[in-house]
Amino acid sequence: MARARRVKRDSATNIYRTCKQAGTCPPDVINKVESTTIADKILQYGSAGVFFGGLGISTGKGTGGTTGYVPLGEGPAVRVGGAPTIIRPALVPDTIGPSDIIPVDTLDPVEPTTSSIVPLTDSTGPDLLPGEVETIAEVHPGPSRPPTDTPVTTSTGGSSAILEVAPEPTPPSRVRVTRTQYHNPSFQVITESTPTTGESSLADNILVTSGSGGQTIGGATPELIELQELPSRYSFEIEEPTPPRRTSTPLQRIQTAIRRRGGLTNRRLVQQVSVENPLFLTRPSRLVQFQFDNPAFEEEVTQIFEQDIEDFNEPPDRDFLDVQRLGRPQYSETPAGYLRVSRLGQRRTIRTRSGAQIGSQVHFYRDLSSINTEDPIELQLLGQHSGDATIVQGPVESTFVDINVDENPLSEDFSAHSDDLLLDEANEDFSGSQLVVGNRRSTSSYTVPRFETTRSGSYYAQDTKGYYVAYPEDRDISMDIIYPTPELPVVIIHTYDTSGDFYLHPSLHKRLKRKRKYL
């Protein structure tokens, strides 16, 4: 007797929808849908005395609540029945309301019998002119002095009188030299120059020299010592630290760098993939799927790529196959001292029956090359400075010819006003010729550039291949085929073939003998 085939029953939810109205639902379906099972009743009765918080313990799927499961010994504890903490402001709040009301004076009402005519009063304006000023002057005469008689001495000697007149002392003159300079950040004036004897211009130092020669007054000549040149205020040196700095901020968080590096470089959990495509730095999404560039979108954030698992699309780069999530860029330093740009990706290789996608984590990275340090060069300040300027212009150089202007070379043969000077003699100098390089079979033409200049003409020819001399004559290059004697097979050799190979006649091929196997 054949066993009847077992048919799987429909889900409890669908059965409950159809049998609830008819009242033919099985007890297990009602208990499961209406949550009246033994486990549900235990939780309902036990929740009256025990509070489990948001752990989400029930007959449903175990998700651990909204925040997931927390390992033991980690995370904050759950406070049962605690009062919430009220956060009060540190400052005393001010009451917000209307400002102080200013009282307004009211005017007395005007009676109806009051006249509306305003009487005018006569008044004089203020006097703006000054008044009379009283002048009082008192004169006090000085004391009177009696006249004095001055004796006059007269000498009758024969000598002349000599009067010594001393000039009035001249006060010393003080000379003050000032200079005013306005600071302009976009313009800098260099006031240094090379002064000459008796002349100074735009210099802070003034040298006064006298004639050569002289005598030394005093002891012996002092000993000459070596002097050091004082540097200018515009010259300075930048001291480089030893060893040179490798980052702009010397403070480095070692623990954070080690923790971040350990998570990405763990080869047991994360696959390591080195990317050589430069699009990984600017447009990494173009390595995962074909798409159009959006200038308004910045790819400095985590990107998620949605793709149907049934449709297989080949990515532009095979290293980014089945990539569903590509993280933001992370920068780190390699042991060799290079800068590394990393992105953590998630593949979707396997898909379960419930719809979940499972895949491994991939660490995509690219190491940037180092920047070689070059020798520093001396820079000059831009501004005004005094000095000699030399201007050299090659195309306009002049050529001096020593001729005698008194002699007329045209006066020996004919008159300088003869019509023979108007005749144009054609000189074949091949100035407009074209150079053809090549043989008769393959002729290549090269365009020679011609530059307009006041100097003599210069021509340039390409010197990258061998030269072929083309003679202006005809040659018969056709060669007759030399046939061998009738005893030998015919071998045709193509003489115009320059490859050095030949075609063998089919009759010259070696015949293969058929081997028969006898039983």
Swiss-Prot record:
- What does the entry's PTM section describe? Highly phosphorylated.
Disulfide-bond pairs as recorded: C19-C25
Subcellular location per UniProt equals: Virion; Host nucleus; Host early endosome; Host Golgi apparatus
Q: What does the record give under GO molecular function? A: DNA binding; structural molecule activity
Q: How does it assemble?
A: Interacts with major capsid protein L1. Interacts with E2; this interaction inhibits E2 transcriptional activity but not the DNA replication function E2. Interacts with host GADD45GIP1. Interacts with host HSPA8; this interaction is required for L2 nuclear translocation. Interacts with host importins KPNB2 and KPNB3. Forms a complex with importin alpha2-beta1 heterodimers via interaction with the importin alpha2 adapter. Interacts with host DYNLT1; this interaction is essential for virus intracellular transport during entry.
Motif Nuclear localization signal per UniProt: ranges: 1-10, 510-518
Which stretches are tagged as biased composition: Polar residues?
A: 150-159
**A Pfam family this protein belongs to?**
Late_protein_L2
The GO annotation for biological process reads: microtubule-dependent intracellular transport of viral material towards nucleus; symbiont entry into host cell; viral penetration into host nucleus
Taxonomy of origin reads:
Viruses, Monodnaviria, Shotokuvirae, Cossaviricota, Papovaviricetes
Taken from the UniProt entry, a GO cellular component term is: host cell
* Family assignment from sequence similarity: Belongs to the papillomaviridae L2 protein family.
Gene responsible for this protein: L2
Q: Which UniProt keywords apply?
A: Capsid protein, Cytoplasmic inwards viral transport, Disulfide bond, DNA-binding, Host endosome, Host Golgi apparatus, Host nucleus, Host-virus interaction, Late protein, Microtubular inwards viral transport, Phosphoprotein, Viral penetration into host nucleus, Virion, Virus entry into host cell
- Native organism is Human papillomavirus 14
Q: Where is this region: Disordered?
A: 137-175
Query: Which protein, by its recorded name, is this?
Result: Minor capsid protein L2
* Purpose: Minor protein of the capsid that localizes along the inner surface of the virion, within the central cavities beneath the L1 pentamers. Plays a role in capsid stabilization through interaction with the major capsid protein L1. Once the virion enters the host cell, L2 escorts the genomic DNA into the nucleus by promoting escape from the endosomal compartments and traffic through the host Golgi network.
What InterPro entries would the database entry show?
A: Late_L2
